[in-house]
Amino acid sequence: MPSSTEPRSGLFYGWSLGESGWNAQMDSNLKRIGRFGFHLSIKDRDLTAPPGSPTAGDTYIPAATATGAWAGKETQVAVWDGAAWVFDVPRTGWVAFIEDEAKLSAFYSGAWSAGIAI
């Protein structure tokens, strides 16, 4: 079993030497890296409810007063995994490309910036 969680990424680490790391925590690590670790691209951040027919990998930032599966998840990153919404709390310094706005936005002091056009 891993002994620690890395605070910035939330990844598990610290397996004992020789211990197999291929368990639920390693699976969680790989999924987390795939969802949030590479070039975060957000389809939209203005929606208050999840889209009706998301495709696996679709990523959003729920807007204020979110409803349904997104209720209480405002400012988090929501990824549809093909069966359910998976959420992650962003950390200071995360940068995301907001597709429908063509802007880069950074997370700081508990909120996403308005962004800069690119």
Task: Name the predicted role of every residue range.
Residues M1-A66, A78, T92-E99, K103-Y108, ...:
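Extracellular "spike/adhesin" assembly and maturation modules
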Residues W85-V86, S113-G115:
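Surface-exposed loop/edge segments in extracytoplasmic proteins
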Residues G72-K73, Y108-S109:
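Short, conserved acidic/polar surface loops in the N-terminal third of protein domains
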Residues K73-Q76, G82-R91:
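Feature captures the catalytic cores and cofactor-binding loops of soluble hydro-lyases/lyases
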Residues G68-W70:
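Short consensus segments that form the blades of beta-propeller domains
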